[in-house]
């Protein structure tokens, strides 16, 4: 606990410097960072944590938090539309070893524009602050902390509700002000939930696969890791936008796209069965279920084991010309031990009660 870790460097003409301290282990307790010049202490920073940092990017289903979307009666009514009550929302995390920064909805500055409550420091995701952080990233962090209690988790939330993917690409204003300032920053992975805006019109929906492949390459490039873990959510069942199926298929296709420089450490979380019966609203419930699935994928990547995935159908063909009987083929390794299950689309659904066995025939093909 009292061990010292040291390193030295030299500032440039502009008085800026970078320094790397090797092999500092993660721990639940904070470190103290001390800067010395010619043997004299110049600055001391307390409460420094070493752990895994994730970028939470995309649009409103990643940004979705209590303070902005549910706390005030007007915002609650517009987002819920009588589908559920506040008691149905997930519980906040309460963990000082989950820290977060929320990037503000501002453009035009080269510096990362943080929300005013983050202007001076990372905030702990405790009872006082967690309502300001998106449900999905905080619940993802909570899952990781359950598995690794000695590793603090940091979240940099860059998500911006109501935005199309073009604004998140290198030529877009969100990229310029929310992602480019992180150039060279060492992160453990990227969490992405976006695509609703692009599903509203045909042209952006048809371009989504190409744009999303480009985005994955660009984010990995700016962060200096060609196979940086990139975990994303496939769009949910919401039917308010005509081209949602096209975007959803594009998100599936990217898993095996030649346009992605490497599909290693790329993982898609299915959300079709997680909404607890709230598919009529664009911000469905079930973020804790998505968080568990994404955390399982990250832990598999970390452990270099097979990334969990739902069955991935590759083709469907009539049997002997009979359209009433179809033979479905699946990508290798994604369909072992298949059985028909019925989704639990009630407000009481949990990660452990999400499905039940059924003898009903398969539907929806």
Residue ranges of predicted features:
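Cell-envelope and extracellular/periplasmic
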Residues: 1-365
């Amino acid at each position: 606990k009292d061990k010292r870790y040291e390193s030295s460097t030299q500032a440039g003409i502009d008085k800026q410097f970078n320094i790397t301290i090797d092999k500092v282990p993660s721990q639940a307790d904070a470190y103290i960072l001390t800067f010395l010049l010619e043997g004299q202490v110049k600055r001391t920073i307390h409460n420094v944590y070493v752990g895994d940092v994730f970028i939470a990017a995309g649009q409103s289903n990643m940004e979705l938090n209590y303070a902005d979307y549910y706390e005030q009666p007007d915002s609650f009514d517009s987002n819920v539309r009588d589908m559920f009550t506040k008691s149905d929302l997930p519980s906040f995390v309460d963990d000082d070893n989950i820290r977060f920064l929320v990037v503000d909805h501002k453009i035009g500055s080269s510096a990362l524009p943080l929300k005013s409550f983050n202007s001076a420091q990372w905030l702990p995701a405790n009872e006082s602050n967690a309502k300001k952080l998106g449900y999905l990233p905080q619940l993802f962090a909570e899952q990781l902390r359950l598995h690794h209690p000695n590793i603090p988790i940091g979240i940099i939330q860059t998500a911006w509700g109501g935005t199309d993917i073009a604004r998140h690409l290198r030529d877009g204003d969100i990229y310029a002000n929310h992602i480019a300032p992180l150039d060279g920053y060492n992160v453990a992975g990227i969490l992405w939930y976006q695509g609703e805006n692009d599903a509203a019109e045909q042209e952006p929906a048809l371009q989504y696969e190409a744009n999303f492949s480009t985005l994955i390459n660009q984010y990995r490039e700016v962060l200096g890791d060609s196979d940086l873990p990139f975990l994303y959510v496939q769009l949910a069942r919401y039917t308010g936008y005509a081209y949602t199926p096209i975007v959803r298929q594009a998100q599936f296709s990217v898993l095996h796209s030649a346009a992605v420089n490497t599909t290693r450490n790329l993982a898609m979380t299915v959300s079709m069965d997680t909404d607890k019966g709230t598919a009529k609203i664009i911000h469905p419930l079930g973020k804790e279920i998505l968080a568990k699935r994404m955390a399982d994928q990250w832990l598999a990547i970390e452990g270099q084991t097979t990334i969990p995935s739902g069955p991935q159908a590759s083709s469907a063909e009539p049997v002997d010309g009979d359209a009433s009987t179809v033979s479905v083929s699946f990508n290798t390794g994604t369909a072992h031990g298949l059985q028909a299950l019925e989704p639990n689309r009630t407000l009481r659904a949990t990660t452990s009660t999400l499905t039940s066995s059924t003898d009903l025939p398969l539907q929806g093909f």
